[in-house]
Amino acid sequence: MYKTITHKTTEEHYINGVRVKPMLIDPLPTVVINERTMNFRMDNRSLWTRYSLGMINFSVALYGGIVNSDNVLENLKKAGQACGDYFVPYYGFNAAKKIGSLLIVIAINGSKVAEALKAKRDISAYETIWDKQINELATYLNELNPQHWPKDTLDEMFINLTALWTDDFRARLAEDFVADSIALDAIIKIAVSGIPNHVNKGYTSIADTISKGIIAQSPLTFAE
């Protein structure tokens, strides 16, 4: 069910069947390895935790028949905009608004996928919509920071995230708690924590790709 993106790479890494790229960003300069950059990166991880798991919270509310699932979706939209607001000091309000808006529409489409699966409807049309939304987001981020945010890498990361959301929806509907746990773990890794770069076999997360890219593009902003 995963969409394959072909790259000229010498090795591939997988997490629960999902292909991910090894870490691409070089170690940060010593001048910016400090408390400020650590807090900056941890703040972004918190934002992406709320966004990536907010989608799962929506499915829990929807499948559990909780009346306020619409409120959960509203919170998910706010989480998407908060991820966008993170860009304000470095790329301005318009860029932040656009990124937040794209993350919101990706989440809204995710809510439609969750609803379609519950109703046993085909989701291929929604997957096509996701592909277009992700392409627009990856293209825009790459324009802001071409050196540190390669479009194909971002494409792959977000496609994997949406695929893992779908995996978790299916697992919850089937009451397969093992598959649910595996999907949740993979979501956190692809969106938030990544895998440590042990002998170049780790991979970075969406959150760390974004924060390290900002730091690497504007290192003096973070120097103490």
How would you name each of these model-derived features?
Residues 2-15, 21-23:
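Serine/threonine-rich low-complexity intrinsically disordered regions
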Residues 16-17, 24-30, 34-69, 73-76, ...:
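C-terminal amphipathic alpha-helix
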